[in-house]
Amino acid sequence: MKALVLTLAVLFFTGSQAQHFWQQDDPQSSWDRVKDFATVYVDAIKDSGRDYVAQFEASALGKQLNLKLLDNWDSLTSTFAKVREQLGPVTQEFWDNLEKETESLRQEMNKDLEEVKQKVQPYLDEFKRKWQEELQIYRQKVAPLGEELREGARQKVQELQDKLTPLAEEMRDRARAHVETLRQQLAPYSDDLRQRMATRFEVLKEGGGSLAEYHAKASEQLKALGEKAKPALEDLRQGLLPVLESLKVSILAAIDEASKKLNAQ
């Protein structure tokens, strides 16, 4: 029930911004969540990709071509792992600098979010209470019908369905009414939050210096990140060359073997 309430609040309030309202007692920063997501995503692609390569090599065509793709894939994985290890400190420094430079702005925004959260919480609690009451009423109405089904024969299934349909429609309509009420109650706070955020960015824009400073620092950090990443990327290029050459030789050998078989027929 709590998950349902929070989901509806997100849908009818401020979208992704509202997620901050309920992310309490979470020591992980937003930057850490982004980095963790990227790591999980890359690892998932790596693992699924290896599975596809293994399935292809196990197939009749894969055995016939004998491209040794799995060996090359493992070499690629090892190369990428080394590069990621080399880039780890560099990217960590970039995220730390960016987090430090935007600390003041994020604190102001979090303060605004917390204020709005305190104002809308009573409406969310009231919505939760009403929804629980509606579910309890629905369960009480449906319970006797379930007993009829257990005691009756198959022909009563249609009768049960006919009885359940209006109850379900009533439940749906009442739920929609509660959701609409919640939407109307939260609308002013949604507008207030958007206005607060717009004001924050407008102050930055009008100040000129602060906004330009953020842009300059971000550009400087990205440039530094690129310079520090060059050695690791060069190592990646050098590591890929033998793998690509091996793959090229395997493909040419497979083509040559296939041509010989065709000519021999």
From Swiss-Prot:
Tissue expression as described in the entry: Major protein of plasma HDL, also found in chylomicrons.
Alphabetized InterPro entries for the sequence: ApoA_E, Apolipoprotein_A1/A4/E
Leader sequence segment: 1-18
Keyword field: Cholesterol metabolism, Glycoprotein, HDL, Lipid metabolism, Lipid transport, Lipoprotein, Oxidation, Palmitate, Phosphoprotein, Repeat, Secreted, Signal, Steroid metabolism, Sterol metabolism, Transport
Post-translational modification: Glycosylated. Palmitoylated.
Molecular functions (GO terms): amyloid-beta binding; apolipoprotein A-I receptor binding; chemorepellent activity; cholesterol binding; cholesterol transfer activity; enzyme binding; heat shock protein binding; high-density lipoprotein particle binding
Any single GO BP term: negative regulation of interleukin-1 beta production
In-chain residues carrying the UniProt-annotated modification Methionine sulfoxide: 109
Sequence repeats, residue ranges: 67-88, 89-110, 111-121, 122-142, 144-165, 166-187, 188-209, 210-230, 231-241, 242-265
Subcellular location(s) of the protein: Secreted
Taxonomic superkingdom: Eukaryota
Span list, region 10 X approximate tandem repeats: 67-265
Annotated Gene Ontology cellular component terms: chylomicron; endocytic vesicle; extracellular vesicle; low-density lipoprotein particle; spherical high-density lipoprotein particle; very-low-density lipoprotein particle
Function: Participates in the reverse transport of cholesterol from tissues to the liver for excretion by promoting cholesterol efflux from tissues and by acting as a cofactor for the lecithin cholesterol acyltransferase (LCAT). As part of the SPAP complex, activates spermatozoa motility.
Protein family: Belongs to the apolipoprotein A1/A4/E family.
PANTHER family, per the entry: APOLIPOPROTEIN (PTHR18976), APOLIPOPROTEIN A-I (PTHR18976:SF11)
Quaternary context: Homodimer. Interacts with APOA1BP and CLU. Component of a sperm activating protein complex (SPAP), consisting of APOA1, an immunoglobulin heavy chain, an immunoglobulin light chain and albumin. Interacts with NDRG1. Interacts with SCGB3A2. Interacts with NAXE and YJEFN3.
Protein name: Apolipoprotein A-I
Natural source organism: Physeter macrocephalus (Sperm whale)
